[in-house]
UniProtKB/Swiss-Prot annotation:
Keywords from the named record: Disulfide bond, Knottin, Secreted, Signal
Domain of life, per lineage: Eukaryota
Signal peptide region: 1-23
Presence of the UniProt keyword Manganese in the record: no
Record note on domains: The presence of a 'disulfide through disulfide knot' structurally defines this protein as a knottin.
Disulfide bonds: C60-C74, C67-C78, C73-C83
Annotated GO CC locations: extracellular region
Subcellular location: Secreted
Main location: secreted
InterPro entries for this protein: UPF0506
Protein name listed in UniProt: Uncharacterized protein SJCHGC09766
Length: 96
């Protein structure tokens, strides 16, 4: 049952992140957000989550932040639900 709720919650978050928010209820730069339909960031901002459902609206997401799409990331790449950091990725590959 726990997995069911997790899947439903993931779907809700995904759908809410896909919609273009134009309403007056959206959050502006550096305001609190949750990456849900309840407190979304205004376009083209993205919610940088620090904990579950708690973050700040940013122009783009730095490496390591939770993402759905590559256009949310400053690097332009969202891989496995995280924004990549090209410099850190190169350093990690060289030191492995």
């Amino acid at each position: 049952m726990k997995q069911f709720y997790s899947v439903v919650l993931t779907i809700i978050i995904y759908i809410s992140s896909q919609s273009n928010v134009v309403s007056l209820d959206c959050r502006k730069l550096n305001e609190d957000c949750s990456k849900t339909v309840f407190s979304p960031c205004c376009d083209p901002l993205s919610c940088a989550l620090s904990t579950a459902f708690n973050g700040k609206c940013k122009a783009c997401l730095a490496g390591g932040y939770f993402c759905w799409r590559s256009d949310e990331c400053c690097s332009g790449t969202c891989s496995w639900l995280k924004c990549t950091n090209p410099l850190t990725d190169i350093i990690n590959k060289l030191t492995d």
